[in-house]
């Protein structure tokens, strides 16, 4: 048994004992974290136990097959089962991002292309909301800056799973590869001559930070309030309900005006701020994380793209893995599993190849 696997089995047993202690529920946050980790370890521990049983059965079947050829078919079947279980278990032994099982904050920002880009940002928002609905996730618009024609200049959404997610199946684990610049090729509604235009929107996916992940000193914050504005900049509220929070040590600025209550806007802004500060702290500490985040959107430019949505050809193309499919309408309606699975599989294969 490999050392990492032995460690997983020991950790699983230890957590099981700790969760059986009634005192653990005096600390709900810690209990939730242990429950999440216990669920993460359940599958690899089960695979290891099944593999151990199959290997024992295989050894016995081989001994019998030496005396009785009728056992050879059983040997072949057990060898296939052994190979399958070993391959599935190995995937769990590859180092994974601990954030994969977290919830996420997703931001969509219009870029090059003016109003058409804002409309495309709205299409992307709807795509992710529909995908979340298909997955049974909960969503909450934290902040939105609508455009004149019903699109969005920028919008932030909290996406939360229901219950404990399996490894890699959490909101962030599923959406992490959506980060980057998305490009659209189509005839805009504002185009009278019927010419195809290219526009872009940027997507940023952040693991949502819990209070225990990062402490924010209130003295490090400057909080400004102002009146909410709608399309065209007109005021839509007679009270100062919108909130802008500036984290003075880093210069990170977050504003929220989507809710009618100043308190709700402040809470939403703090959620986004914590997520951004957590991501920034991990970037600084981990070179690998910095490289991964560098592939996400910095400036929304048409030249740096991860995916193209081509309306005339009904085609979606993910340029990172050469993925192509002619089901654009379905994808924009939230049918994202195929491309996400392809990206996840490519990432797993890359990490497995790099694992000794």
Swiss-Prot record:
InterPro entries: PCRF, Pep_chain_release_fac_I, Pep_chain_release_fac_I_sf, Prokaryotic/Mito_RF, RF-1. The gene is prfA. PANTHER family: LD18447P. The lineage of its organism: Bacteria, Bacillati, Actinomycetota, Actinomycetes, Frankiales. The modification N5-methylglutamine is found at residue 234. It comes from Parafrankia sp. (strain EAN1pec). GO terms for molecular function: translation release factor activity, codon specific. This is Peptide chain release factor 1. It is found in: Cytoplasm. SMART domains: PCRF (SM00937). Its main location: cytoplasm.
């Amino acid at each position: 048994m490999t050392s990492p696997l032995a460690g997983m089995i020991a950790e699983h047993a230890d957590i099981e004992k700790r969760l059986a202690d009634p005192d653990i529920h005096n600390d709900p946050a810690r209990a939730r974290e242990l429950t999440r980790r216990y669920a993460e370890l359940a599958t690899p521990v089960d695979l290891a136990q099944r593999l151990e049983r199959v290997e024992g059965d295989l050894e016995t079947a081989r001994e019998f097959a030496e005396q009785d050829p009728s056992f050879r078919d059983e040997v072949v079947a057990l060898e296939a089962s052994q190979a399958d279980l070993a391959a599935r278990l190995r995937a769990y032994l590859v180092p994974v991002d601990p954030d994969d099982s977290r919830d996420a904050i997703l931001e969509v920002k219009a870029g090059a292309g003016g109003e058409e880009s804002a409309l495309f940002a709205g299409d992307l928002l709807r795509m992710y909301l529909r995908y979340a609905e298909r997955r049974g996730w909960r969503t909450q618009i934290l902040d939105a800056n609508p455009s004149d024609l019903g699109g969005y200049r920028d919008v932030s959404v909290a996406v939360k799973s229901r219950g404990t997610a399996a490894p890699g199946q959490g909101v962030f684990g599923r959406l992490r590869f959506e980060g980057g610049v998305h490009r659209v090729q189509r005839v805009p509604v504002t185009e009278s001559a019927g010419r195809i235009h290219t526009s872009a929107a940027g997507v940023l996916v952040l693991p949502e930070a819990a209070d225990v992940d990062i402490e924010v000193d209130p003295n490090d914050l400057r909080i400004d309030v102002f009146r909410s504005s709608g399309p065209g900049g007109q005021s839509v509220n007679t009270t100062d309900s919108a909130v802008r929070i500036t984290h003075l040590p880093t210069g990170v600025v977050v504003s929220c005006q989507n809710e009618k209550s100043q308190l709700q806007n402040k809470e939403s802004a703090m959620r986004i701020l914590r997520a951004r500060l957590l991501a920034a702290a991990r970037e600084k500490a981990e070179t690998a994380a910095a490289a991964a985040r560098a592939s996400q959107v910095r400036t929304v430019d048409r030249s740096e793209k991860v995916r193209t949505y081509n309306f005339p050809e009904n085609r979606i193309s993910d340029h990172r893995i050469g993925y192509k499919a002619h089901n654009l309408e379905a994808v924009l309606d939230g049918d994202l599993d195929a491309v996400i699975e392809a990206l996840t599989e490519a990432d797993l294969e890359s990490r497995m190849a790099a694992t000794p």
